[in-house]
């Protein structure tokens, strides 16, 4: 049976993967309300398409931090990809490169920055947590820089791991044949033994709970890579992030895996965009499963979106070919959405192309 949309990979991955692995990728925090809401909120945004516009040629190309990419659809960092498929991050890196877009490598990857760089050319960002031992952070950043990575996506919503109950029930542990490749050979000190998500026996216990805005300024002293602050949900924090030197903001709720009952990212996006006043680009991850979702995010002011779970599920189902197909399907759907909405380039996508539940009834301009 031919796969015709991104969501269909979910069921295939569920059937293929061990329960512990699938649940790790699929689950959210606590009641998983935000996990559902990340999807549901997109469904409450409707289109106001414009007609009789020549849409014979559609241009989806854009630039992110000065790097030209083929479309505003990028790959979010997801941990432990070799649990999904033996090729893991290698396959994802090759697929993103073939699609002409950016891959963000998780620092909790099962392939190292050097290994991912060895897959060939491509624009790659490195996701970073700040650890208690700052020497570890420095080593990770230097290695990413040396391996040709172009930016840091600093995760700021995880002073502690969220409570993901399926991981507790399944007693989640990384399969014994896999390691956190970026930490091999680094002195991590004594690991904390805790029971947050059964994960803390790994590097999680080393995440620095004292992380604050001054650490973003410190990071800028050890690297020239631009820093994207990932995990912003409010206008207040967007403004502070810019003051602290952020080159961009990723509106993210960590795939609904941290604090439950935060808004869907698509619901938080516009507040953040307004607060930045165009000073830095704003991106979104969380709940994107259709080209229509990509369009809605851009109409609300995002410069691009990142996808996480769809990549991992497609990887589990079909390896590199699956990830390529997910990126291609989203690209094709997004192109079609642009055409049917009357937009020939990303700059033509405006707030007037959508209507949200928080919009007041419109008084149409006199023509």
Curated annotation (Swiss-Prot):
UniProt-annotated location(s): Peroxisome
Active site: 254 (proton acceptor)
A GO CC term attached to the entry: peroxisome
Pathway: Photosynthesis; photorespiration; glycine from 2-phosphoglycolate: step 2/3
CDD domains: alpha_hydroxyacid_oxid_FMN (cd02809)
InterPro entries recorded: Aldolase_TIM (IPR013785), Alpha-hydoxy_acid_DH_FMN (IPR012133), FMN-dep_DH (IPR000262), FMN_HAD (IPR037396), FMN_hydac_DH_AS (IPR008259)
Role: Catalyzes the oxidation of glycolate to glyoxylate, with a reduction of O2 to H2O2. Is a key enzyme in photorespiration in green plants. Glycolate is the preferred substrate, but to a lesser extent, this oxidase is also able to use hydroxypyruvate, L-lactate and glycerate as substrates in vitro.
Subunit field text: Homotetramer.
Protein name as it appears in the record: Glycolate oxidase 2
Upper taxonomic lineage: Eukaryota, Viridiplantae, Streptophyta, Embryophyta, Tracheophyta
